[in-house]
């Protein structure tokens, strides 16, 4: 059978130095040049996408309290924010100063060396929600979140510079930090050295990184897929992770360093009511709105996907407060938590509830690797007569030997609960726990 033309194998001879055939070295060079050009175009495209997602807001929604009068109170860490006599407590990280925000939009700064507090008030300071002392500040600077943005107060008695008298309130100088749409600040956190203040606000879907000394600011979007504002910010103790809780549902765990910004979304079906880190940084304890369940969020190492490591966060149930809690023979129903407060040494935690008139003090047991337990210790009730309930709580350091749990009640009464235990075993002995 004869072969067809299609079946006859062809033999093609290449002449290396023929004029019409390019040099192999030149071919390789052209190929590499084209690949480099295409890669550079791809890199520029991805860089533009990264900038559009991380450094500029996708939308600039401006919700107002007039449109939803209950919104700020619903997401606030204070119980009954609108009517509470005291809305927020903030302790200075290294001194005995304590700042309180009241419902008259005043800041009360207490110093144990003085009986009467210093009062800071301004027409620009309205609807105050939160405050944060600046670390390592020579002038005891205090940032206050409000409707306008941020009111930054400086104690002029500690400054050696001349300031504008129009911005003076007694012994303090006021500087207002504003950003378009970034109104009704809900939460704030200073970074480790006090050079950057991070804030969230109802008026925007981004968070802002402020540098007060240089008057610079950067906008970041923790979750580019959502247009929601953020209600709560919590820096991890090592300042490597920023927890950002959405006003709608879910939260972002953002890892920060000088070269990159990585985020992971957790619990996307529910709004986070409150959250707090343990001082060791191993656990983030949180509860969702409308729930009685306390969860722990733990960094479970990193998984390498191709060349890009991604953080793995494990969420586990710690306990359910729907059940009756027993402390020292007393049994009470707790219900939904309003806010958490953590002892600076990580030995105790305190909880305010949405519908109860007491504060529940807990002992933290994280002796088991990768797990944390909460042991109920005491129901703390108001130490004065009357129908009162707690509105806000905070732990602070009173002296080298004593720490304080400060409880503010709806009538304005301030209660101090002294704590002396320096370790878990010592706390067990004090409270007769085995």
Predicted stretch roles:
Residues 268-272, 312-335, 370-398, 431-434:
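Conserved blade-ending motifs and adjacent loop-strand segments that build the rim/top face
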Residues 96, 104-107, 148-150, 204-205, ...:
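Loop/turn residues immediately N-terminal
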Residues 98-102, 142-146, 197-202, 242-246, ...:
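Conserved beta-strand element within WD40/beta-propeller blades
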Residues 78-82, 121-125, 177-181, 221-226, ...:
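Surface loop/turn motifs at the tips and blade-to-blade linkers of beta-strand repeat domains
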Residues 68-74, 109-119, 152-175, 202-227, ...:
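Per-blade loop-tip surfaces of WD-repeat and WD-like beta-propellers in eukaryotic adaptors/scaffolds
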Residues 396-434:
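Blade-level signature of beta-propeller repeat domains, shared across WD40, Kelch, NHL, RCC1
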Residues 1-97, 317:
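Intrinsically disordered, low-complexity acidic/Ser/Thr/Pro-rich linker and tail segments
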Residues 89-95, 131-139, 180-182, 188-194, ...:
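Loop/turn segments within WD40 beta-propeller blades
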